[in-house]
């Protein structure tokens, strides 16, 4: 491996794909993880209609397309579409030849072994990567925060995980997964807005609601209190202009949707909220390391970007934990991209260069090599 070839770092999330070069401080390309196919037969010859669109292009033509997400709940479910996304990443977004750069991909905690092998196979056989590595998302977020011990509460668009990490190793027995994340909150907001008389049904309209969520929603420190405030005055109301110029007003929906993170019953789910899940995850760890975990609760992922979430998390976790424990919530401002940033740090370390899984090793041992090299 010569020094000058930068590794490519690709963080494939359920909602967004983040890609760029190792050593950079932010991803060059961030685009939706979607593949769209035309709903209707094209009538105008020579319009150059493609049979599929990826990312932003699919997003901008969403009115005429059926959109599919190849990654559900953090795990790849549709490999053909996933290949399209990777192809788009290399050739259209980063404009690089994948056969010239080592590739670092990220995976969800507890990703099935077969998936990991399939990823490896596609990178080496379809894209001819010279070297490859796959790393667990939460571990990278922790690296990005400059720690080697802590518990990461990583919540993206499709899935939320709590991952305790001690001295750089994740503790699989204590990892908890919660199928409640950004996409569900968008659904929750759609439901709340429908009660107000605004209807959003198509995949395209759903993207509008996602934007409303990202711009206007926040987490209340005290939900009941906030509901009373909202009922008594219009101070919490905000307006939002839809693409067609219509203006809608949104009040208590602003904090009712994100509240589902702490009270999943709002979505009809029987699971524990993110605060309880974090607590349960810590509780599954050895007594001796719990203090270190409580003192380093790192938030990561786009769904942790709601204003007020860190304070609320601090409050809820403090009330669950033993009184002698000092709870510290770490919410880095760049946490939306901290998985990618961690990958960028890792792939550019000189000590990491001999950990890559090379094409030669793959040719000798097959996809199973990934379990021996990447852990």
Swiss-Prot record:
InterPro entries, per database record: Actin (IPR004000), Actin/actin-like_CS (IPR020902), Actin_CS (IPR004001), ATPase_NBD (IPR043129)
Keyword tRNA-binding attached: no
Organism superkingdom: Eukaryota
Subcellular location: Cytoplasm, Cytoskeleton
GO molecular function, one term: hydrolase activity
Keyword tags: ATP-binding, Cytoplasm, Cytoskeleton, Hydrolase, Nucleotide-binding
Catalytic reaction(s) noted: ATP + H2O = ADP + phosphate + H(+)
Pfam families per record: Actin
GO cellular component: cytoplasm; cytoskeleton
Main localization category: cytoplasm
Function: Actins are highly conserved proteins that are involved in various types of cell motility and are ubiquitously expressed in all eukaryotic cells.
Stated family: Belongs to the actin family.
Name of the featured protein: Actin-2
Native source species: Suillus bovinus (Jersey cow bolete)
Gene it is expressed from: ACT2
